[in-house]
């Protein structure tokens, strides 16, 4: 049930004041800044539909990710966007028109990677200010020494920026943003770390800025009468040889006449400085730095700082730290954030948890979100972030057993589709399943925003009832009176040390032994090893749990060893840009870390395994915490589906198993599955996902290829 609309709170009204940037006017102060999706111009319909949802949700500006200006900055396989030629421009036009259809301005970020460009399709040599190789280690960037850009190279690349800007203007972009941050080509010229030139493009700050200033000037001359000109600039690169805030203030004064908008961030190629997860940086950390630039600039400033609270956003604008609020992750989690604030429905906001699943999924080729299952599915599956189709047969009663992430998502979706009755039943007292105790780990408190949002939505839906502290067996379910049953009973960590590396339990480990622990026993049951004892955490998962419980135990005074078969502790956390921070924290807490060790056996007092080169490994320990694999808790489902006659007699038409009970996976995946079940509840077989739309190329009858957008 939708709440009664009220005007935005008085302290939020500043967010909805229009502001001029050059020849364009923003309808409010909420700016969807450049951010990657991995869709780009290779999946233009997916890309356009994703951006259009943000425009429909009320953002004043919707931006592309970085768009490569010519083949010397080919970024394959990053699946970013290109604007090299008219074919690319046609694909951009689809996105621009989709954004304009909802009243937002469209912005493009023009990019050249310089020494960091991947060039795997173009196979051109990397270009650089002065022949300094990429500081990205293989395989992130190909090895090799880049070409020092000649004057001809400089002019050619600058012309590529101009040509790209003209193409952007011609397809309707309102804002052209020249990327001078994140350690790419313009930033490489600005940086004394990369720029060792002795000509007019190196040496002093003014000389190092010359390439960037000339590029801005040429772009402005070409399209500045039609488009607003912006540039994305790091206020600090946060490295020992980088760009300081004082440098940035000087750069802003140099370039202020050439731009209409300053698009600010923090950090360089280590973009974790700018978009670290909530475990690492607090909301609004960079605002004071932006304020220093704002005081030096004559043009408006947009800044990003992991802002999710409309209160803090409004305060930042009112206090003059920024003029416009930049957001990427919050727009992924809730495309309709602006509309909800405008309508006074802040309680309905899906607040970004800052877990950076979006970053890890982007790097794997498809941006998705743990908080918002519809992100990236707007075209592929036709899902709208706020609207559901009504069930063709709403006279159904659905029993959802298990109120973890998948169960909550399925129950809410079915209730929003108009099911007569949805009961969400859990043996625990509170919503959340395994996610609730995760919030007790250091730095992961904001993960429980997932639960908070769904708790509010459940309270608003009159046809959805949460029934806590109720454990149901198969007989209870058959007697319940529901026409449909969804089993979402989750998973539990293996108590025997079953691992991916051996596909077997640890020899000598007996589940339930008083010296063996699982994360559930530590976080839910409150069990602990003997005070002051030596504890080993065996982490075969490699994400948040192993490092999290190691940190917890170290903070409680235990002597902790963390053993992992992976090449790095918390290796998966590198994908979410928090691995280094996790390892630094563990090291600072005295946790001894042992990498590339595969355990095979354990007994009270000692564990056994092999190292990277098959050398024997042994370690004395008083207690062993097993963070290896999660095992589905699917016994209830299996018992139900074994007896089809009993289900038929009970009037149960279908039983579905979802989430970790089906297959233990990351939060985003089980959330997606619960959401998909609700969306496809009346499909011929809801257990199997309906086909999604694929693009951009399809075979045609004559054997050639065609674009589905033609």
Residues of each region from the PLM?
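A Rossmann-like FAD-binding core segment of flavoenzymes
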Residues: 448-494, 511-514, 518-527, 531-533, ...
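Helix-enriched interaction subdomains in cytosolic or periplasmic regions
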Residues: 353-366, 476, 482-509
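Beta1-alpha1 glycine-rich phosphate/pyrophosphate-binding loop at the start
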Residues: 262, 393-465, 537-577, 581, ...
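Flavin-dependent oxidoreductase catalytic cores
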Residues: 1-401, 405, 409-416, 422, ...
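Internal hydrophobic alpha-helix adjacent to the cofactor/substrate pocket in enzyme cavities
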Residues: 334, 339-340, 410-412, 549, ...
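Short amphipathic alpha-helical segments
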Residues: 75, 314-315, 338-339, 411-413, ...
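Active-site-proximal substrate-binding core of FAD-dependent oxidoreductases
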Residues: 572-575, 661-663, 683-710
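Glycine-rich dinucleotide-binding loop and its adjacent helix/turn
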Residues: 379-391, 457-460, 466, 494-556, ...
């Amino acid at each position: 049930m939708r709440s009664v609309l009220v005007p935005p709170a008085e302290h939020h009204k500043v967010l909805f004041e229009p502001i001029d940037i050059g020849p364009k006017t923003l309808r409010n102060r909420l700016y969807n800044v450049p951010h990657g999706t991995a869709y780009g111009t290779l999946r233009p319909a997916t890309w356009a539909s994703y951006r259009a949802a943000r425009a429909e949700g009320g953002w004043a500006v919707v931006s592309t990710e970085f768009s490569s200006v010519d083949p010397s900055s080919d970024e394959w396989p990053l699946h970013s966007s290109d604007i090299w030629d008219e074919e690319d421009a046609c694909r951009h036009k689809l996105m621009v028109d989709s954004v304009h259809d909802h009243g937002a301005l469209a912005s493009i970020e023009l990019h050249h990677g310089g020494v960091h460009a991947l060039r795997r399709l173009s196979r051109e040599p990397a270009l650089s200010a002065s022949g300094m190789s990429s500081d990205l280690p293989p395989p992130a960037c190909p090895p090799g020494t880049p070409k020092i850009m000649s004057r001809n190279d400089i002019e050619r690349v600058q012309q590529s920026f101009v040509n790209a800007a003209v193409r952007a203007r011609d397809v309707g972009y309102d804002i052209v943003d020249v990327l001078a941050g994140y350690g790419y080509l313009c930033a490489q010229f600005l940086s004394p770390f990369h720029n060792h030139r002795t000509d007019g493009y190196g040496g002093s700050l003014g000389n190092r800025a010359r390439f960037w200033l000339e590029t801005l000037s040429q772009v402005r001359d070409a399209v500045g009468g039609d488009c607003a000109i912006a540039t994305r600039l790091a206020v600090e690169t946060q490295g020992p040889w980088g760009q300081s805030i004082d440098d940035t203030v000087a750069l802003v004064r140099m370039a202020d006449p050439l731009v209409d908008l300053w698009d600010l961030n923090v950090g360089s190629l280590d973009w974790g400085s700018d978009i670290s997860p909530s475990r690492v940086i607090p909301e609004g950390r960079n605002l004071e730095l932006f304020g220093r630039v704002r005081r030096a600039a004559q043009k408006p400033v947009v800044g990003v700082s992991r802002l999710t609270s409309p209160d803090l956003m409004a305060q930042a604008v009112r206090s003059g730290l920024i003029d416009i609020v930049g957001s990427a992750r919050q727009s992924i989690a809730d495309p309709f954030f602006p509309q909800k604030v405008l309508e006074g429905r802040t309680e309905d906001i899906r607040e970004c948890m800052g877990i950076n699943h979006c970053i890890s999924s982007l790097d794997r080729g498809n941006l998705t979100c743990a908080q918002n299952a519809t992100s990236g599915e707007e075209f592929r599956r036709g899902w709208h972030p706020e609207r559901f189709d009504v069930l063709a047969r709403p006279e159904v009663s659905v029993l959802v057993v298990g109120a973890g992430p998948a169960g909550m998502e399925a129950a809410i979706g079915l209730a929003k589709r108009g099911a007569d009755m949805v009961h969400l039943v859990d043996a625990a007292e509170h919503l959340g399943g395994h996610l609730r105790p995760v919030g007790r780990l250091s730095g992961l408190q904001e993960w429980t925003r997932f639960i908070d949002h769904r708790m509010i939505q459940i309270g608003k839906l009159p046809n959805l009832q949460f029934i806590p502290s109720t454990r149901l067996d198969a007989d209870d379910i058959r007697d319940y009176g529901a026409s449909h049953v969804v089993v979402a009973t989750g998973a539990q960590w293996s108590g025997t040390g079953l691992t991916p590396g051996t596909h077997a339990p640890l020899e000598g480990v007996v589940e339930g032994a008083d010296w063996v622990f699982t994360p559930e026993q530590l976080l839910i049951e409150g069990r602990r090893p003997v005070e002051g004892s030596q504890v080993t955490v065996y982490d075969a998962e490699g994400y948040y749990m192993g490092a999290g419980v190691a940190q917890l135990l170290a903070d409680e005074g235990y002597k902790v060893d963390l053993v992992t078969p992976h090449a790095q502790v918390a290796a998966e956390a590198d994908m979410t840009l928090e691995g280094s921070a996790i390892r630094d924290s563990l090291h600072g807490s005295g946790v001894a870390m042992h990498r590339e060790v595969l355990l095979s056996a354990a007994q009270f007092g000692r564990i056994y395994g092999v190292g990277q080169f098959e050398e024997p490994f042994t370690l004395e320990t008083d207690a062993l915490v097993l963070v290896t694999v999660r095992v589905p808790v699917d016994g209830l489902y299996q018992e139900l589906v074994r007896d089809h006659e009993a289900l038929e007699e009970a009037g149960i038409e279908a039983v579905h198993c979802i989430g970790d009970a089906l297959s233990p996976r990351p939060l985003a995946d089980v959330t997606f599955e619960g959401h998909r079940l609700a969306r496809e509840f009346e499909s011929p077989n809801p257990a199997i996902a309906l086909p999604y739309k694929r693009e951009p190329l399809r075979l045609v009858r004559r054997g050639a290829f065609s674009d589905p957008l033609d």
